[in-house]
């Protein structure tokens, strides 16, 4: 059983080489015990690993779409022979792209550490419950501050106001990155059952909103008007999604491929 931090750091180096910051990725190390403590040891979201087990959170930044994903779309068009053929064969482009990149990373990683599990932001149990709470991972790992509504109540005031959410919808929290604000996404968590890092201390997440009133405004924007993406700009992030990326995610799934057609038909001059 491996206990050395040096091995954990070598694992992270491999991940960072294959999912580089230049191509729009970040990795953040944390202990499973820190996550389980945050969600509650008896919670259905707690993970069945030793407290000192190593985990890595993978998130994407604006460059993932505009650099790595763009290259992937162009390469797929070449492989399939036409952009229309790619559209026909690949129904979930971002998910397919990420699966390809994670498989390439995994092949390299197995040379350093054979035993690991990957949980995605879309990984569900048979009961349709998330296998892991990504926003909690992000806060625990110090990647992004997780603003939870229960921590920003105001004495004598009922908040959030009742009746504004749709049926069966819950008023939920929001994670904001210290550089990208809401212009990022949690993607996956890698868990290494045989790698123990008992002495590792996670960094504290840095808040970009400090006034409770600002936090409540951001949470209301996120919960009530998330489709306009205005919540992403709270905290004045220094990097944002491009116009193309915003349009892509703002379209219905069936219409998203058309946003990307200029990448192969019109050349770079038509892309942000």
Curated annotation (Swiss-Prot):
Q: Name one GO cellular component term.
A: cytoplasm
What does the cofactor section's free text say about binding? Can utilize both FAD and FMN.
Query: Per the UniProt entry, what are the Gene Ontology biological process annotations, in alphabetical order?
Result: cobalamin metabolic process; demethylation; glutathione metabolic process
Chief localization? cytoplasm
Keyword set, alphabetical order: Cytoplasm, FAD, Flavoprotein, FMN, NADP, Oxidoreductase
Binding locations of substrate: 121, 132-135, 146-148
Q: Indicate where this protein resides in the cell.
A: Cytoplasm
One Pfam family, please name it. MMACHC
What sort of enzyme, by top EC class, is this? Answer: oxidoreductase
EC number(s) stated in the UniProt entry for this protein? 1.16.1.-
The answer to whether UniProt assigns keyword Cytoplasm to this entry is yes
Going by the entry's taxonomy, the superkingdom of the source organism is recorded as: Eukaryota
Return the similarity comment.
Belongs to the MMACHC family.
Q: What name does UniProt use for this protein?
A: MMACHC-like protein
